[in-house]
Amino acid sequence: MDIQLINIGFGNIVSANRVIAIVSPESAPIKRIISDARERGQLIDATYGRRTRAVIITDSSHVVLSAIQPETVAHRFVVNKEVQANSN
C-alpha cells in the first residue's frame, strides 16, 4: 500500500488513505463535529487564520480545517489517484 499525500493548502498535507469525508463547514451538524473535536483535542486547524472552507474528517476521528474549497481538495484526490494509476 502506497502512501498518498494531498496538499490542503499553505503547505499542509494529509494522508489520502486516512480521509473519510471532505465537507463544507456551513451546516449545524458539521459545526457540532468541529466543536466536539476541539473539546476532545482532535481538531487540526490548517487555515492560517483564514476562513474555514473545508472540513476533512479522518478515520482516526481527527477533524482538519482547511481554507480551500471542498471541491478543490476533492479534485486533488482525483488527480492524485489518476497519477497513481498511470504510474502502475
From Swiss-Prot:
InterPro entries registered for this protein in UniProt: RemA-like (IPR007169)
Give one Pfam hit by family name.
Answer: RemA-like
Top-level division of the source organism's lineage = Bacteria
Q: Which family does it belong to?
A: Belongs to the RemA family.
Q: Which HAMAP family match?
A: RemA
Q: What name has this protein been given in UniProt?
A: Putative regulatory protein PCC7424_3427
Q: What's the source species for this entry?
A: Gloeothece citriformis (strain PCC 7424)
